[in-house]
Design a protein with these regions (language model features):
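Short membrane-interfacial helix/loop motifs at transmembrane-helix boundaries
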Residues: 23-47, 146-182
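N-terminal signal-anchor/first transmembrane alpha helix
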Residues: 2-27, 60-71, 77-94, 100-156
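Low-complexity, compositionally biased segments
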Residues: 5, 16, 32-35, 56
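Interfacial helix-start motif at the membrane-water boundary
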Residues: 47-60
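A composition-driven signal for long, intrinsically disordered, charge-rich low-complexity tracts
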Residues: 32, 97-98
């Protein structure tokens, strides 16, 4: 066995292919009754490729990441461009899902994991944390956990305080804050 050969999960191509397979096989929209209790029509409707929708653009970012080496940029410039692409794609995913009111499905979990792995590779190319992929991935996971379980829900609560249904109602904030039980 070749000792210098990297494990398959340390290849960018693995994560790109995994994200594409997830897009093809898993629903990109949330299923109301879960993966196994949904009907075949609901399952088909939740697939990102079943109709022209925003979820196909979400997965385009990993394909663009795979095409970055074709630009033949210097190593540092390419790594920075990859990180900008990943950051822009992640921001686009969450902003567009919020604006379009799309509930994310199982394939998006794989997409976020793939984007995290690809960001890890790009940070390692830049020698962040001495290029230690484990430390970089751990730090990224901690940051993502804080964002998804603390920052995002808090922002969602504050945004809902300013809206009454679909209408902007800033006076509602004072009404909520002056409740006796708060």
């Amino acid at each position: 066995m070749n000792a210098n050969k990297l494990p398959i999960i340390q290849s960018a191509n693995f994560w790109i292919i995994l994200a594409v397979i997830a897009f093809l096989l898993l629903p990109s929209h949330a299923l109301d009754y879960g993966l196994f209790e949904s009907t075949s029509d609901e399952y088909l409707g939740a697939m990102g490729w079943s109709s022209l929708n925003i979820t196909a653009l979400w997965f385009l970012s990993v394909i663009l990441y795979g095409l970055m080496p074709l630009l033949k940029l210097p190593k540092d410039t390419q790594a920075k461009a990859e990180l900008y692409l990943i950051a822009a794609a992640t921001l686009f995913i969450f902003v567009s899902a919020t604006i379009c009111k799309v509930s994310m499905g199982y394939s998006v979990i794989v997409l976020i994991a793939s984007l995290t792995a690809l960001a890890t590779f790009s940070f390692a190319k830049l020698k962040v944390m001495q290029g230690d992929k484990f430390i970089i991935a751990s730090l990224l996971c901690i940051i993502l956990l804080i964002f998804f379980f603390i920052v995002y829900p808090t922002l969602a609560i504050f945004v809902s305080m300013f809206y009454d249904g679909d209408t902007f109602a800033p006076q509602q904030v004072m009404r909520i804050l002056t409740q006796s039980y708060i």
